[in-house]
Amino acid sequence: MTDNANSQLVVRAKFNFQQTNEDELSFSKGDVIHVTRVEEGGWWEGTHNGRTGWFPSNYVREIKPSEKPVSPKSGTLKSPPKGFDTTAINKSYYNVVLQNILETEHEYSKELQSVLSTYLWPLQTSEKLSSANTSYLMGNLEEISSFQQVLVQSLEECTKSPEAQQRVGGCFLSLMPQMRTLYLAYCANHPSAVSVLTEHSEDLGEFMETKGASSPGILVLTTGLSKPFMRLDKYPTLLKELERHMEDYHPDRQDIQKSMTAFKNLSAQCQEVRKRKELELQILTEPIRSWEGDDIKTLGSVTYMSQVTIQCAGSEEKNERYLLLFPNLLLMLSASPRMSGFIYQGKLPTTGMTITKLEDSENHRNAFEISGSMIERILVSCNNQQDLHEWVEHLQRQTKVTSVSNPTIKPHSVPSHTLPSHPLTPSSKHADSKPVALTPAYHTLPHPSHHGTPHTTISWGPLEPPKTPKPWSLSCLRPAPPLRPSAALCYKEDLSRSPKTMKKLLPKRKPERKPSDEEFAVRKSTAALEEDAQILKVIEAYCTSAKTRQTLNSSSRKESAPQVLLPEEEKIIVEETKSNGQTVIEEKSLVDTVYALKDEVQELRQDNKKMKKSLEEEQRARKDLEKLVRKVLKNMNDPAWDETNL
């Protein structure tokens, strides 16, 4: 190829080329380049889109002068002879690209309809899969197919208008909200469809082949279900090509650019949703290490989930966590060191939870704060602004729904260890009547752990409000009524106790009541009497401490105020065995006892791990010793060994 004085050398790119130096020229496959300088060594200089630079000559081919422009219906457009109008070239290219968009939309719509009518609808009427699995496979593909038919009709209407009045970009923008909703929903369902394909691959493959699909049939179905993603990725490229050959003053140019940006964002969102749903499906189906409580499937459906970075109050350490929002709680998980599974870190009830969106600073970006009367303050940093918006919106909506279903009286200032009030019971003047059954809300009592997350959950029964209505009262901290067998013992206590309290412990009774013969027969055995005596000691200790607190605090409250339960002050009798073998009976608070028991459990777990490790090492050593002994015995019995050692 040589350049002559009569005509300039024009070439077409055979491959994409991306510049690595400032003096090089970038181009895409099919671009037309005007060569300005030909040098030996494989690098030429040329001009493309107003830029001049060097490019490899083996990436292009020469456009011969005999090649002429073709009609818009052809797939390629040849370089015109010298002197041909450039505007006509752009118009011809524009028509070619527009026709290509319309034809591929027709083809895509027919492919979706074919997958539905040939395979999925017959599969729905057959008994190969359950109705749930079939619905996972179909997803909302029917809605997408109907939408694509509407899109094709809209594009056809655009092409009927004169070129200067065609609004292809405006057509895409007007349908973008509906398209976004449909494709995001399809992406969210696709991981479940893939799971069904994997689990029932053999049955589905046989069914597809009976319907005329080529072998392997499962591959045909997998490809058909992936077509929406493949088509979505092509829109930005097609619109970019249309914009390149559009006149600068075309009224649709700005809408085309907006459509390109919208499709790029939609494609990125779809990929993110698919990854998030795949991770969510993995968490829900695989076992979680150190899991506590009921099975994760009993928590309901996942409202939202993502990977975040958390930082607990008073700590500088930041940890990566996976947060999953369920209807009534927020689940926190961490990934195992080798990313082979997930580890349970804790649950946070949405009841009483407060969400505060934070401004960006040097220490955190895209962050919000979780706080509450029963929740240790947690700083959550999201990966991007969209993730932050989703979390704040879902959590605020969830906490509002929870607060409506479980109405509570919010205190003005409450320490983190206290419990919020519970739903109001009927007025105290109806205390003699049968109490109304209410479902108490559960709360989490925070205590120190390796991850700083609350674990212990305590349920409290419905309580009566004080006579004087207040926004917050210590009477809301009283415990649930004792069980009826224990309540019978309370009846034998000092009758000087408040009659109002006794009415809560026992149903309305006659002034003088004697134990029946049946009750006397039940308590006749020695074992029953010993058990009752032990229970009575616990109740006596409780009543003694309660009376003492009531006497000390009588100056700060009315005498008619009911007794309260403060977890940090409530005492119980604990029997401990010291290291020297001496048994000591001590009085400890409930909180201290819970923490002490937790520490003991952790020590037992560590001891168990050490014993298990020692046992494994001993077993390995015994196996090695056994192998060595067998080898020695074999050598001793080997005749060849005897000859060599004579």
Swiss-Prot record:
SMART domains: PH, RhoGEF, SH3
Highest taxon above the source species: Eukaryota
Compartments where located: Cell junction, Focal adhesion; Cell projection, Ruffle; Cytoplasm, Cell cortex; Cell projection, Lamellipodium
Keyword Phosphoprotein assigned: yes
Region spans: Disordered: 402-464, 500-520
Annotated SUPFAM superfamilies: DBL homology domain (DH-domain), PH domain-like, SH3-domain
Post-translational modification: Phosphorylated on Ser-516 by CaMK1; enhancement of GEF activity and downstream activation of RAC1. Phosphorylated by PTK2/FAK1; this promotes interaction with RAC1.
Cellular component terms (Gene Ontology): cell cortex; centrosome; cytoplasm; cytosol; focal adhesion; GABA-ergic synapse; growth cone; lamellipodium
GO MF entries: gamma-tubulin binding; guanyl-nucleotide exchange factor activity; protein kinase binding
Domain (PH): residue spans on this chain: 295-400
PANTHER family found in the cross-reference section: RHO GUANINE NUCLEOTIDE EXCHANGE FACTOR 7 (PTHR46026:SF3), RHO-TYPE GUANINE NUCLEOTIDE EXCHANGE FACTOR, ISOFORM F (PTHR46026)
Oligomer status and interactors: Interacts with SCRIB; interaction is direct and may play a role in regulation of apoptosis. Interacts with PAK kinases through the SH3 domain. Interacts with GIT1 and probably TGFB1I1. Interacts with ITCH and PARVB. Interacts with FRMPD4 (via N-terminus). Interacts with CaMK1. Interacts with PTK2/FAK1 and RAC1. Interacts with BIN2. Interacts with YWHAZ. Interacts (via PH domain) with NOX1 (via FAD-binding FR-type domain).
Protein name: Rho guanine nucleotide exchange factor 7
Organism in which the protein naturally occurs: Rattus norvegicus (Rat)
Species classification: Eukaryota, Metazoa, Chordata, Craniata, Vertebrata
